[in-house]
């Protein structure tokens, strides 16, 4: 059963797809298979992801059925999908419609595939989860350990080269750019060797956040920075090693969020 928020989003996506096909009929097969043949957002996303992650050894149909079953029994995952689509649409200036993340943004695809692998990990289907992690890394160049904990309203922008380790915790409404590493320092081997990223954090391209540390709410991490120590909330940090350069006004608004018209 669809939530009202999912249903409204899905109807907007389908309507946009129909309008686009009038201008670009050559995309008919792609749009029919990916969007217009489906009654639900979850069915569409299962189709898109299974097409990208299948191999000659595990078929598209088998992966589609696995994903569809997970979505059918876990409304919370679909709720996160909806929030992720909206996050990309609100924060990425090149995204003009909700259809764009669903069809074209590999950061979104990698994130939603991770959510499915995370579910499988949590029910102890470790081998299938590991298979999906490997395929996600190969196809999207994004390496997220299925045991990592990631909230909703997440944007992985460009996404190439993002690495998120096993013990990482990411709260809601976080934006992460390409080539970011959230990992360990190599000095600890326990599960608590990775960072915690609080809500509304923005992590610039190429930044590395390493070790059992906490990045506070609303922090902005500059591109290329290396963070090795706890960062208090509502500051901007840059440099190697990262240092605080200014304080930020307490706000729940993400740095790149577009104003509503």
From Swiss-Prot:
Pfam families: Hexapep, SATase_N. One of its GO terms (molecular function) is serine O-acetyltransferase activity. Its EC number is 2.3.1.30. It comes from the Bacteria. One of its GO terms (cellular component) is cytoplasm. The keyword Acyltransferase applies. It is an enzyme of class 2 (transferase). InterPro entries: Hexapep, Hexapep_transf_CS, LbH_SAT, Ser_AcTrfase_N, Ser_AcTrfase_N_sf, Ser_O-AcTrfase, Serine_acetyltransferase, Trimer_LpxA-like_sf. Keywords: Acyltransferase, Amino-acid biosynthesis, Cysteine biosynthesis, Cytoplasm, Repeat, Transferase. SUPFAM superfamilies: Trimeric LpxA-like enzymes. Gene3D superfamilies: Hexapeptide repeat proteins, serine acetyltransferase, domain 1. PROSITE patterns: HEXAPEP_TRANSFERASES. It catalyses: L-serine + acetyl-CoA = O-acetyl-L-serine + CoA. Pathway: Amino-acid biosynthesis; L-cysteine biosynthesis; L-cysteine from L-serine: step 1/2. It is found in: Cytoplasm. PANTHER family: SERINE ACETYLTRANSFERASE. Belongs to the transferase hexapeptide repeat family. This is Serine acetyltransferase.
